[in-house]
C-alpha cells in the first residue's frame, strides 16, 4: 500500500509536554512481549489498575481485543503479524503524544518489528517488558487451550510450537513469570517507572 504524496502533518497547538504537565507524569509505551500464556495480559491488566490507583493516565491495548476491531482483517502470517505490530506501534505513539502511558500486551514475536516501534518513539519512551516463561510452563497453563489446538494441528503458525519467537536481547525489564507473582511483577515495573522519574 503506497502513501499518498498529497497529505501534510498538522501539529497540535497543545504539545505532548503540555499534556504530560497536566497529567503529572511522562508518557511512555510499556510493551509486553512473550509467548502465549506467559502472563502478558494478566500482568498488564494489574499494572493498569495499579497506575489508576496512583492517579496516572494509562490505556491498555491487548492483542486479542485489537483483533476484534482495528486489526480484524489480519491473520497470523509473518506479513500480517508485522502489520499488526506496525499498527499497534502507531496507535501507541498517538497515546504517548496524548500524554498517556500506553500499555501493550502482544506476543510480537519478531525482534525487528519491536525495534521498529522503538524507532518511531523518542529515546526513553519505549519500555520493553519481557515476560520470560518456558514453552513447557506456558503450555501447562494454556488458559485459552491454544497449545492443545496447535499440537493437534488445528492452529497453524502458532508461536512457540510451529512459529518462532525471538526473545529480546536487552529489554528494559524482564519478569520471570514462572518465579515471580503477578504482584511482584507489577511492583518491579512500578519501581522502574519511579526510578526513571516517569511517574
From Swiss-Prot:
SUPFAM superfamilies: P-loop containing nucleoside triphosphate hydrolases (SSF52540)
Single GO term (MF): ATP binding
Catalysed conversion reaction: adenosine 5'-phosphosulfate + ATP = 3'-phosphoadenylyl sulfate + ADP + H(+)
Biased composition (Basic and acidic residues): 10-19
Catalytic site positions: 108
Pathway noted in the entry: Sulfur metabolism; hydrogen sulfide biosynthesis; sulfite from sulfate: step 2/3
Keywords: ATP-binding, Kinase, Nucleotide-binding, Phosphoprotein, Transferase
Domain of life from the UniProt record: Bacteria
Annotated residues for binding of ATP: 34-41
KW Phosphoprotein (keyword) present: yes
Coiled-coil region: none
EC number(s) on file: 2.7.1.25
One annotated GO biological process: sulfate assimilation
Region of interest (Disordered), ranges: 1-21
NCBIfam families: apsK, PRK03846.1
PANTHER family linked: BIFUNCTIONAL 3'-PHOSPHOADENOSINE 5'-PHOSPHOSULFATE SYNTHASE, PAPS SYNTHETASE, ISOFORM D
Function: Catalyzes the synthesis of activated sulfate.
Family in the record: Belongs to the APS kinase family.
Protein name: Adenylyl-sulfate kinase
Species of origin: Staphylococcus haemolyticus (strain JCSC1435)
